[in-house]
Amino acid sequence: MEAKETARIAKVCEKNGADGILVGGSLMLKNNFEENLALIKQNVNIPVIIFPGIFNFVSPHADALLLLSVITSRNPQMLIGEHVRAAPLIKHYNLETIGTAYMVVESGNSTSVQFMSDSTPIPRKKYDIAVAHALAGQYLGMRILYMDA
């Protein structure tokens, strides 16, 4: 998406009561990431928070970064590997991190995050498995649980 369009949408979100703007995703391209963040930051008065797909989506233009651990993945890169790679940049920018347990739940369709993170979604009707994952995230000190279906 073009940076100006992104900034316009962020303004609309703020006007309609959003508490913050998440920027990122599983397949976001790096080529206009910094420009998008800077423009959004200039155009809204609510927190701009990075929702990183991989380690290099770290920027001083954001207010914070969701430090995502895909707790439904058994891929060590998604559990800790990307965090280790991002840590020096996070420290350099003195960026606030928000520990986030990312849980993929079965939706009936394969999703980008499921594919990119090598994650096995939690079956929709297996509440005990979802609760166990959520508790594990809590006990690991995660501040937020983000569920994606």
Question: Whereabouts are the PLM-identified features?
Answer:
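Alpha/beta enzyme core
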Residues: 1-149
